[in-house]
Amino acid sequence: MKYAFIFFLTTLFYTNPKNTKNETYPPFIVFQLFTSQGCSSCPPADYLLEQVKKNTSNSNVIVMSYHVDYWNRLGWKDPFSKKIYTELQYEYARKFNSSSVYTPQLVVNGNEHFTGSNKSKLKRSLRKYTSENTSNAIALSNIRKKGRLINIDYKIKGDLNDKIVSFALVLEEKTTFVKRGENSNRKIKNSNIVINQVSLPIQDKANGNTSLNIPEIFEVNDNYRIIAFVQKPNLQITGGIQKSL
């Protein structure tokens, strides 16, 4: 089954003629996984996200892991968890008319959500969003890393009305030995872990620069990448890009 999935990803980006359509802006897809090392249902979703990252070379297929903090009470404090990511998940819950949140939850382009370990729905999302026009494109340039400070220049194309642009610093990969809680005595590998994120109103300014800091708990020389995406007020993502440091 694993190899069939890898074959699916490979053929999707190398043989699907829809990817060669002459569009104003290339298709993209952003997978935002809300996960926790304290949740026993999350490792299969973490693994599936890892496979998407590992087996697609297309820079417009973007995966992000947001570690929420509400399962820390079960005995294991997820070292990557932040309250702000729980708050972001509740923003999506309001959009989807839900009064509660769950893990693992996979949000796709801010438009839809499903259980993060659902491979068939993930495949359908890949087919759908990698063949659709997009209203924004982002270019990142002149990325400078000095110590813990990362500076980024950016340029956004397309409709900018009422939109915001977000920049996330993600840790490419980390394996953690979980000592307590539902995943006690397990090694869990997480991919593209969001460790810092800033959001800016675009306000008709297509060009700009911003900066992100590597938090003190992380090593300066670990492998990181920058992810940028544009959103409407309703949280729909209308453009995205990523670059490794």
Name each model feature, range by range.
Residues A4, D69, N111-H113:
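Short, internal active-site loops enriched in acidic
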Residues P79-Y102, N111-E112, G116-L245:
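Short, conserved sequence motifs used for protein processing/export or organelle targeting and
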Residues L106:
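Ligand-binding face of N-terminal immunoglobulin V-set domains in extracellular IgSF glycoproteins
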Residues P17-S100:
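Active-site-proximal cofactor/substrate-binding loop regions of enzyme domains
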Residues F8, F13, D46-K53, V170-K174:
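Short N-terminal helix-initiation segments at or just after the protein's N-terminus
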Residues L74, N109-E112:
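Charged, low-complexity surface segments at secondary-structure and domain boundaries
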Residues M1-Y25:
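Bacterial Sec-dependent N-terminal signal peptides
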